[in-house]
Amino acid sequence: MGGRRPAFLFAIVALVAGVAALVAVVDLNQPGSAKQASPGSRLGVAPRSPASSTTSTSPPVTTTTADPGSLPQTNQLPSASTPAFQAEMAALWAGVVSDSVPAALPAFFPEAAYVQLKAIYSPQTDYTNRSVAEFGLDVGAAHQVLGSNPGSAGLIGVVVPQQYAHWVPPGTCENGVGYFEVANSRLVYEQDGQIHSFGIASMISWRGTWYVVHLGAVERSTEQGVVEDPEAGEGSSAPSSTC
């Protein structure tokens, strides 16, 4: 008996060591083990931090619309039936009803186009001090035609005599660029159950769109607003070769 004890003890020690090794292997596969690989690293990618799990958004895409006046002229004859022209006339009418030049300006010839068009000294100054100033006087005069209750007047439409539209070549009327011109269009409106109208003295083209360049008069003898040919009914448009 005494000679077998070392072998017996050795067997017990070996058994205990084997159990300990088995426990260690099982422990490595338990959730939360320090040795456990994350799903991300098992896929060959770095695990994402909590912050990176939020949805990222790209900067909003912005679009810019170029000022048509900054672009070169074309020889396209404008149409009076386009949404752009109708929007211009709605702006013009809103300016007349409210006696507001800023409200009406979208219908007026663009400043950048005017600078390209005019072959004169300081076209910017002429645009502001003469063209827009006269336009403002005429908007105010048309507002007065609507009487004490201008808000009761509603725009019906604008009659453009396309048959009278003509090309004005470069070098005419101190202009360095050619354009189409049409005179004596009629702005038609209804007020108190009656149809009325007044004229738009001159519109000229830029890149295939009509713009007002003279509302009440092409030429004037006084610094006062002018209303062109106010009439009951739709009125009529006379041909003109003005530039």
What are these regions (language model features)?
Residues A20-R42:
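C-terminal region of N-terminal signal peptides and the immediate post-cleavage residues
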Residues W93-V101, P106-Y114, G140, Q144-G147, ...:
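Sec-exported extracytoplasmic/periplasmic mature domains
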Residues P169-C243:
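Low-complexity, intrinsically disordered terminal/linker segments enriched in charged
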